[in-house]
A protein has these predicted regions:
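Extracytoplasmic cell-surface/polysaccharide-interacting catalytic and binding patches
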Residues: 1-124, 128-247
Length: 247
């Protein structure tokens, strides 16, 4: 057999190189010569060499606090986490979250209130069936291509985990409000991240959503905030960014 190429040698020394992905790395690198070897490995590991919703894997650890649910990782239709009802002063209508996420959201909202900021939930846990109805409505309204940029297909929504909250409003103008600025600055202190940040649409597959927060625990949230990552990049699903906290 012939000698390994320079790109293969560069890939093999990366701690997050998966040999079984080598063919995908090489193909993706050829299609994207502007990317570094590290970026090629990172993006292929995330799944970005494939169109969204292709090569979907079923989530194996749905109860993990850092569970990855996205356009490549899907929850089963019958998955339902352990939930508690959110206090009525903190939500619009009846709503449910996992207990720790609820307790931390309550603590965050209480602190925000002392600083003149009001935060409340407008959408938290959604069942598979509810998400199916939400998504179908958006597809009917805007067509599938556009709907896919702002709404998850059933099974691919983080809302099904009971770890996600839409705060205050799902209006693009929210990002310019004092509430949104406070949320972005302080949510990591309570274990939340802005799940779909501005400028990361190619990685998350979603438009910027300054209102959409996801509970991952304080330590992980602070790392994600510090390095300006998405959850996909943090988990890596093995990435160029792994070293600061894994090394």
């Amino acid at each position: 057999e012939g000698a390994l190429s320079q790109r293969e040698l560069e890939l093999l020394v990366l701690p997050y190189c998966h040999v079984e992905n080598m063919g995908r790395y090489l193909d993706y690198g050829e299609r994207h010569p502007e990317l570094t070897t590290e970026q090629v490995a990172t993006e292929v590991n995330i799944g970005l060499d494939r169109p969204f919703y292709q090569g979907i894997q079923m989530v194996e650890d749905p109860d993990s606090q850092t569970v990855l649910v996205n356009k490549y990782h899907q929850l089963s239709p019958d998955y339902k986490p352990d939930l508690v009802r959110m206090g009525t002063a903190y939500t619009y209508g009846t709503a449910y979250l996992q207990r720790e996420a609820w307790e931390q959201f309550k603590a965050m909202a209480d602190q925000a209130r002392t600083e003149g900021i009001r935060l409340w939930n407008v959408s938290s846990y959604r069942s598979y069936g509810t998400q199916e109805r939400v998504y179908d409505r958006y597809v009917s309204q805007d067509g599938q291509s556009l709907a896919d940029t702002y709404s998850a297909r059933p099974g691919s929504s983080e809302h099904q985990t009971g770890l996600t909250i839409d705060c205050n409003t799902i209006d693009d103008a929210f990002g310019e409000t004092e509430e949104a600025k406070w949320l972005a600055a302080h949510c990591a202190d309570y274990g939340f991240i802005i799940r779909f940040p501005d400028g990361k649409e190619n990685i998350t597959g979603y438009q910027y959503e300054p209102w959409h927060i996801r509970y991952v625990g304080v330590d992980v949230a602070k790392e994600i905030q510090k390095y300006g990552l998405t959850l996909e990049e943090y988990l890596g699903v093995d990435s160029v960014y792994a070293e600061p906290w894994q090394g």
